[in-house]
Amino acid sequence: MLRRSLIFLVLLSAGCVSLDPHYSTPESPIPATLPGAQGQGKAISHDWQQVIHDPRLQQVVTIALNSNRDVQKAIADIDSARALYGQTNASLFPTVNAALSSTRSRSLANGTGTTAEADGTVSSYTLDLFGRNQSLSRAARETWLASEFTAQNTRLTLIAEISTAWLTLAADNSNLALAKETMASAENSLKIIQRQQQVGTAAATDVSEAMSVYQQARASVASYQTQVMQDKNALNLLAGTTLAENLLPGTLESLPEQMISLVPAGVSSDVLLRRPDIQEAEHNLKSANADIGAARANFFPTISLTASAGVGSDALSSLFSHGMQIWSFAPSVTLPLFTGGSNLAQLRYAEAQKRGLIATYEKTVQSAFKDVANALARRTTLEEQLDAQRQYVKAEQQTVDVGLRRYQAGVGDYLTVLTAERSLWSAQQELLALQLTDFTNRITLWQSLGGGMSSLK
């Protein structure tokens, strides 16, 4: 009978009212279309393994996803939120305990007697007539789901950061190689001009200029050697372990342009809603909405039921053989008459929290739009800049070649050659910077559009 009663009570609570406010996703405070986007309709979700094509970088990303401490903490936060949801959800069901009790009493008139009693089940349950426990359960579930998207966003950010760090190392390897090449050339030029000065065909200012170029290149070599070591340290920190040398990149020029795919952005700003940070913000908002329902329910009576059933005997030895059946049922009603304004304060707090989270959601959407807009704006001029810079490097190389031929023919001075070589070096460095920007812009665009989720779960 007790079992049937408990089932009835659970079904009764399942049909209780909810005092949660009606929830609707806030309207996105952004334009309907992305500025500078190409193509039709919505962007296609690209898994990171479909965007990154270098097998070394793919392996580095996989290692990082398994070993990075930020990811591990995010996973632990998911487990914590899931456990809290399970704890909160348990309040929707009765608690049933088994109990064994024994009492001993002494009578001055009749001597000593012993009574033993065992309660087979003791159950307590709070009828959720106004949906308070249901609201708390929904709030905990939404918090758990928000933590899932927090972890996805952590993984997405990690992929972008470690890819950028890997490419930065490649760029600094290129800069180091270029600085060494420039230093060797400048050292050779310095020796030539020093010999010319000894025979009176070069001025002291020519030697000083050549020395300046050489020392500048020498300082750059030392600087880039330090930078390369720091790049490796940053990469190892993101990976969560020391990476093998065969997983590290060579120079940036050795990487094909399509090593990082260019993800089409589409034209609709609705694609931003799949970003994990936006989904996290919405689940937090849904949790706050359910908290309002729980706060509203505090104004209504609480009905608690306690029941027990079992057997009893006047001797412990005969308890389980021929004991008497016993039972009890104790309902109670608690009506909040005066709480010193606590319930009203809780409701106002929950409503204020929701307003704040609406603002957070809207700002997250706006920030996402800005991220994509900035990435697309950079993309529109990047190809033209790269082409112009490549032509500039070619022109500077031709200037160096012409200067050398004129010098070798005796109709030009070596100072002109040194000046041209310095300009060429600067142009080559700028080209490397633009090539790195091209790669990182592709990664940023993929990330800002929400990335690919299938391998991040």
Predicted regions and their residues:
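Terminal intrinsically disordered/low-complexity segments used for targeting and assembly
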Residues: M1-N66, R141, Q225-L273, A315, ...
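Transmembrane beta-barrel architecture of outer-membrane proteins
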Residues: L57-Q59, T115-E117, T164, E209, ...
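Short segments within alpha-helical structural elements
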Residues: E187-N188, Q216-N246, A295, L382, ...
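Periplasmic alpha-helical coiled-coil/stalk elements that build and connect Gram-negative outer-membrane
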Residues: V17, N133, F149-V267, R378, ...
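Alpha-helical heptad-repeat coiled-coil segments that mediate oligomerization/polymerization in large
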Residues: G200-A203, A368, A375, G410-Y414
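Membrane-embedded beta-strand positions in outer-membrane beta-barrel channels/transporters
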Residues: V61, E117-T121, W166, S268, ...
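Small/polar, glycine/serine/threonine/aspartate-rich low-complexity segments that form flexible
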Residues: A43-H53, A99-V122, L136, E245-P264, ...
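Sec/SRP-type N-terminal targeting helices
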Residues: Q72-K73, N89-A90, L127-R155, T205, ...
